[in-house]
Amino acid sequence: MTELLDKIIIRFFFILLTCLVLMAYRYAHGLFYTPSRSSTLRRFFPTNNASDTIHLFARILGVVIIFHNLTINMAYGIWWASFNFCCEGILVFFLYLGSIYIIEGISLYDFEYSAEITERKNFAYATVSGMQAIAVAIVLTSIFKAAQHSLTLLFILWPFSLVLLGITTKLFKYVSQLSFAKMIIQGKMAIALSYGGYIWGWSFLIAAAFRNNGSAIQWYAGHIILRLLLSIIIFP
């Protein structure tokens, strides 16, 4: 009976946290994309703007991917586990949004959300942004697992992963013959799908490189770099 009650309480806190995260996203979105603040706080109608729908639901999917891999430690009781889970979930959420903002600042610095999504309804831009958000979630999921509930290790690996992902986005123009900025402005889906496949492939490679015990950070960082260099050799 006690075990059943604990599961019910955990599920209640999980649902509550998920709802709070979805509500908080509206305000966090306005914080990161200041020109769109007034439109974000209004009611959302998916059928009115397909680009905005892709942009939003890719981020929701990213949150789901990360939350799906969070673990709950019941060693100190149900209430401490629930409190720890909520704190961890909130931290993960804001790290995720911050990561998206940083990576978009590197790859999409020539574009503005309000101009491309709200005004032009640029589906190519929304697709690139959405697939990039999912790629960030894939990498962060591996980071949180490698950190093993250690904040110190998390805040060492997190910037390291962003640097790797940022370098990856900058290298796209060297491995692709397509004009990224020009084709995004024209709304060409070819560049969106090409970049999406590229960033997803690299996100899986980077995530796989972090799947190891991170107790010795110097050896761990060297091991990650070695894995990535080996991946470059076999990556087409």
Annotate each PLM feature.
Residues 72-80, 143-152, 180-181, 210-221:
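Membrane-interface helix termini and inter-helical loops of multi-pass transporters
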Residues 76-91, 99-129, 145-153:
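Membrane-interface helix-loop-helix junctions at boundaries between adjacent transmembrane segments
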Residues 23-47, 176:
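Membrane-interface helix-loop junction between the first two transmembrane segments
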Residues 198, 203-236:
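Intrinsically disordered, low-complexity segments enriched in Gly and acidic/Ser/Thr residues
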Residues 89-112, 164-186, 230-236:
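Alpha-helical transmembrane segments and their immediate juxtamembrane interface regions
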Residues 40-55, 113-128, 180-195:
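Membrane-interface segments at loop-to-transmembrane junctions
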Residues 3-21, 80-97, 148-165, 219-234:
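Alpha-helical transmembrane segments
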Residues 65-68, 131-142, 195-212:
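Hydrophobic alpha-helical transmembrane segments in multi-pass integral membrane proteins
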